[in-house]
Amino acid sequence: MSMACAPAHAGCAKADFEAVVDEAAGSLRDMNAANKPKFQEKLRLLKDKRGWTQEQFLHEAAPLVADDKINTFDLQSTALLEKIASGGETGAAAAKPDCAMLDTLRASMKTLVETQAEKWTYMTTKIDAELAR
């Protein structure tokens, strides 16, 4: 997937704005599809290793999926998603597309994907450390 920004003077079309939104959604879907099953399997392994009941598991594993750092990643991602969606709609609806705005949207999408990758890395590192104990 190319995240390079085209120069603002190169011209852009309304469809380019919609494409940025679609690309962000696709990137996130792909990342979740790649990471979620592996992470869930590690959670199951931890539950089995510790011999937790389902109730214990829900309590003990909670910090692995929700802590201050994960919440910060989620807040950053939500803000970026809103910015991308809003900018995509605004850019697609404009009489004359603003190519500088398109570059900003592409940069936001890149940051969003990086933020989610950092979140998955952080969560995976946490659960790997627990499995190693």
Could you say what each language-model-derived stretch is?
Residues M3-P7:
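N-terminal signal peptide c-region/cleavage motif recognized by signal peptidases
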Residues G11-K14, E18-V21, E60, L64-D67, ...:
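Heptad-repeat register of long alpha-helical coiled-coils used for dimerization/oligomerization
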